[in-house]
Amino acid sequence: MTLIAPSFAALRPALGAAARAGDLDYVEIVRNSGPVVMAVLLLLLSASIVSWAIIFKKWLRLRQAQVQSLEFLDAFWQSRRLDSIYQKAEALSASPVSQVFRAGYVELSKVTARKGGENESPLVDQMGGIENVERALKRAAMSEVTALEATIPFLGTTASAAPFIGLFGTVWGIMRAFNDIYQMGNANLATVAKPISEALIATAFGLFAAIPAVVFYNYFVSRIRVLDSEMTNFSNDFLNIVRRTFFA
């Protein structure tokens, strides 16, 4: 017992310092960060804010696209007139599938207008009627995918770059912390805790920006892939209907 008591007495200052370190004010740590670490934190915070704005806006856009596409497909297969479906497609402008149909319908109208409303397959073949419709569908689908993918690359960039930017801030902060410790000539827990926490908070900011970005980036890419598949399937079905009806 006489040997253990002095050991606890010697540890008491260190334990007190650890307790004080546990009560660190992280807001104050951020405010007292050096210029380089502060610039890193502001950059990561800005990237996180922009990412969340993109996530919210893109989630609403893709949800609207999916709902209206399902509504349009139901109307398409229940209707017997292309002109009435075209009016429905105009009302469902957020649906990429409806916009693909509109492009195909407009091109089909041009082809039928050229042949005077008569079903003359040789003349239509010479003008490349069905090929024109197919190209119009493909162009519209590519345009819709491009529009849906807008701003998503920023999420991918944030997901891949933010951890490294945060790591840079941490490395810089640790270098600064060790320099301060060297100048003070004292390396106890109370001296080390605050500057090391200041350095590590940059990594925390990097992860805070990167994790939602990578999760929603993969989610949005998956949703867009589904919509792209729906546009492709619809284009094939629409071309089959056009061939049977106008080019048989």
Walk through the language-model features, giving the residues of each.
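Hydrophobic alpha-helical transmembrane segments and adjacent short intramembrane/lumenal linkers
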Residues: 185-199
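Hydrophobic alpha-helical transmembrane segments of polytopic membrane proteins
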Residues: 199-213
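Juxtamembrane loop-transmembrane helix junctions in multi-pass integral membrane proteins
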Residues: 22-38, 147-153, 157-160
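Alpha-helical transmembrane segments
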Residues: 45-65, 167, 174, 209-224
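Transmembrane alpha-helix/interfacial motif
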Residues: 2, 33-80, 84-85
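Predominantly long cytosolic amphipathic alpha-helical stalk/bundle segments
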Residues: 66-165, 176-188, 215-248
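Residue-level signature of catalytic and energy-coupling elements of molecular machines
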Residues: 34, 52, 85, 101, ...
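Short, strongly hydrophobic alpha-helical membrane anchors
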Residues: 1-32
